[in-house]
Amino acid sequence: MNPLRVIVKEEELDFAAAAAAAAAGEGSPSSWAVGVMDLPRPMEGLGEAGPPPFLCKTYEVVDDPGTDTVISWGFAGNSFVVWDANAFAAVLLPRYFKHSNFSSFVRQLNTYGFRKVDPDRWEFANEGFLRGKKELLKTIKRRRPPPSSPPSSSSSSSSSQHQQQPAAACLEVGQFGRDGVVNRLQRDKSVLIAEVVKLRQEQQTTRAQMQAMEERISAAEQKQQQMTVFLARAMKNPGFLQMLVDRQAGQHGARNRVLEDALSKKRRRPIEYLLTRNGETCAAGESAAMLAADGVAEPDGDTTPRGDGGGGGGGDTESFWMQLLSLGLEEKQREDGVAGGVQESNSGGADVDNDEEDDDDDVDVLVQSIYHLSPK
């Protein structure tokens, strides 16, 4: 006979006797309660299913401080981040999951309701996957594929509730990480504003440069058109060229006459003084010799004595005329003034005929006119 069965029977008899005695009032209720408490009971959670092995292994690898450089908990502790996906797939996946496919790991996370929190990095979260609360892993259930047949109203309501549960988890994660997201967006906004300001300044500078270039191009085109019109008129109408020559000669003649009058007034007094010195009259050559001997100063303050040259045809006289004719003229007409001074001095000393001009003078006038129309 099995002794265990006998013991059970004895316990049952003792329990029955104690219950009968308690009912008759012979035994105390405390003894009957002690007998009830001594009965064997099953362990708590013995029949409940534990969390899936995938979740347990994922929790272990995330909670391991030695792998924080590759994978670790998020800032709020309600998510985990894979910092180095290549190292995670090459080292940790073969160690814990017997494969090295990171995409397969991500798909398996999706089947358990994990959602990606940050689109810029591998950060996943679930409402039952929290730091320091491993017992909540049993609340994470694997999602079942939707049935192929059209579901009834009750099944559709249950499936909608099941689909809304991960969304609530994502909302919860968003509430925890809202401050970080706002700070990152503010930094991105400030960077974009600085770039926009810089591009706007560069645009304004480029626009100003383009306007200045357009003005220079328009001015050059206008001068080119004027030069083309001038050349066309000069080629078609020879009288137009002669008119320009006469006008320029008249302008130079007027300036030369003014300078000649001023020079004659300045030189008249020394010459008259020499001619009437000591109450005697002398010839032009003798007066020049006396002027050189006495060292009479020139009108412009030059004390250099003049050489002999009846009519003022010497080299010093020519340079003196050239300096006087060049005074007051603009820089672009300096060559014309010098040429006019030389021509005036030659006409006063050697009586050269000013009416004899050759073809070279016409060419010079044409070149000077083109020079005045050319861009500076």
Curated annotation (Swiss-Prot):
Give the coiled coil ranges.
182-229
Q: Where is the composition biased (Gly residues)?
A: 307-316
What the entry lists under PROSITE patterns is as follows:
HSF_DOMAIN
Q: Where is the composition biased (Acidic residues)?
A: 352-362
Role this protein plays: Transcriptional regulator that specifically binds DNA of heat shock promoter elements (HSE).
- The molecule here is called Heat stress transcription factor A-2a
The GO cellular component terms are: cytoplasm; nucleus
Q: Tell me where the transmembrane regions lie.
A: none
Q: Where is this motif: Nuclear localization signal?
A: 265-269
Q: Could you list this entry's UniProt keywords, alphabetically sorted.
A: Coiled coil, Cytoplasm, DNA-binding, Nucleus, Phosphoprotein, Stress response, Transcription, Transcription regulation
A single BP term in Gene Ontology:
regulation of transcription by RNA polymerase II
Annotated gene: HSFA2A
Known SUPFAM superfamilies for this protein? Answer: Winged helix' DNA-binding domain
Q: Which GO terms describe its molecular function?
A: DNA-binding transcription factor activity; sequence-specific DNA binding
Q: Oligomeric state and partners?
A: Homotrimer.
Instruction: Please tell me which stretches of this chain the record labels as motif AHA.
Output: 318-325
User: InterPro entries under this entry?
Assistant: HSF_DNA-bd, WH-like_DNA-bd_sf, WH_DNA-bd_sf
